[in-house]
Amino acid sequence: MRVKHKPWAKDRLEEFPAIYIKNPEDFKGRWQEVFGNNNPIHIEIGSGKGQFISGMAKANPEINYIGIEMIESVLVSALDKAIEADVPNLRLVARDAKLLEECFEKGEIAQIYLNFSDPWPKKRHTKRRLTNPTFLTIYERLLPKAGEIHFKTDNRSLFEYSLVAFSEYNMLLTFVSLDLHNSDYEGNIKTEYEEKFSAKGFPIYRLEAKFDRN
């Protein structure tokens, strides 16, 4: 999807330092200071326009959330939703997922959300998929032993690829749904994409997984 460039996005984000963290590397290992508490930290990689992460922060005040989106012109929409939600447990960061280890210490993140990530369908772009083993290695370092990855997509090919990638990485699949909205799963908070695709009748695929470190 092509994103309309918003030249004013960076300045707009920087107007709200209580929400937008301009230099997340400065807080590596010190994110508890940012939030002012010791609550667990959950991150969403590729948070887009922010509907999911804002909804999660509002529904779970006992958890700290960080929405990560590399495109500032998109992240500025997430900022607007964060302002509207008016929650103290949400921060936003503009960074590429490849740089996460520069922003977070080992084991500092309790849970990772991957929602409707770019499927990168061409074979030569496989390594760009956020469920590629290269990224799984990064996630494994960021998560504690009990940490989990929650993944949602409407793209069956990406879901099947991810199931295989997680399994070959010796991860434990603790939840798998091939049609989330017609399952017994409760507490689902939809993303903008999720609302769009489910309204057209597409099934939503979801899984939960954790690293097997026994």
Curated annotation (Swiss-Prot):
Pathway: tRNA modification; N(7)-methylguanine-tRNA biosynthesis. GO terms for cellular component: tRNA methyltransferase complex. Signal peptide: none annotated. Keywords: Methyltransferase, S-adenosyl-L-methionine, Transferase, tRNA processing. InterPro entries: SAM-dependent_MTases_sf, tRNA_(Gua-N-7)_MeTrfase_Trmb, tRNA_methyltr_TrmB_bact. One of its GO terms (molecular function) is tRNA (guanine(46)-N7)-methyltransferase activity. The active site is at D118. The keyword S-adenosyl-L-methionine applies. It catalyses: guanosine(46) in tRNA + S-adenosyl-L-methionine = N(7)-methylguanosine(46) in tRNA + S-adenosyl-L-homocysteine. Substrate binds at K122, D154, T191, E192, Y193, E194. S-adenosyl-L-methionine binds at E44, E69, D96, D118. The keyword Amino-acid biosynthesis does not apply. Its EC number is 2.1.1.33. PROSITE patterns: SAM_MT_TRMB. Belongs to the class I-like SAM-binding methyltransferase superfamily. TrmB family. Catalyzes the formation of N(7)-methylguanine at position 46 (m7G46) in tRNA. This is tRNA (guanine-N(7)-)-methyltransferase.
